[in-house]
């Protein structure tokens, strides 16, 4: 028997006044719908996020298996980790222009979803700074990257940047363990990034510059029971453009199926995911976890119409 789990990340929502008190899912056309129901994907007392929620949907209780977001992303990037290593998600973000980072405002947690080539050039420009500080900065995809501290203590208090969009960053800068190092890296990276030619060109083009880094999602290497052993599935795969979801798959022993044209945002090739899924099922996969990030990105940006459109594209080009 074939099994497929499809997850439209962030697709559910609260009623929204500008939409007449409806949700995007209510207003979207989705003729392929089946039965609706309610479920709790994040256990009570745990922070709500794509990491804990996707672990649950994969079948792994976050209260048992969750060890942080960034080590899952590190797994998808092929970064080897020892049990004593600590990782952090490193976003390229846009902060308001302020002499002191404590006086800045979080303008954009993704720097206008910066292009991959630009992001890698910026990461390469600041990586020597990190090496000199005794840590590693690994380039990921678009605005999502990874900081690794080898044999380090954990316990930093960090805020996801998408939770403070449009707000002052004061009060949300690193606290707790590794505070001094993380804050120093942020401040020194900002000095380099603000002057970088890539950002000067982005400003001239009317795009947000990636003028700072932002650390969050601290964690250590997870230990997931292999999916095959846990559920008796002979061959399983993951289709997603998001490092986090790919990383859960890698840690669970599933295959990550590459799909050209998918972006982890709402300008993405929805149909390509559908075609890849059909081909995978025909070629011997018994289980697929298909993840689409588009609705979640629209939600973070407050783009209701784009979220409705994304839901309709999912129904028409993947489910149908």
Locations of regions flagged by a protein language model:
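Short, hydrophobic/amphipathic alpha-helical packing segments
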Residues: 27, 119-124, 182-193, 270-278, ...
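A long, amphipathic alpha-helix that forms part
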Residues: 206, 297-320
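Short loop/turn segments at strand-loop or loop-helix junctions that form parts
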Residues: 8, 97, 291-295
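Anion-binding catalytic surfaces of enzymes that hydrolyze or transfer phosphate/sulfate esters
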Residues: 220-306
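Active-site nucleophile/metal-coordination loop of metallo-enzymes that catalyze phosphate/sulfate
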Residues: 2, 11-127, 148
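Residue-level marker for buried hydrophobic side chains located in beta-strands
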Residues: 4-6
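Glycine-rich, mobile lid/loop segments that gate access to catalytic sites or pores
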Residues: 109-212, 218-220
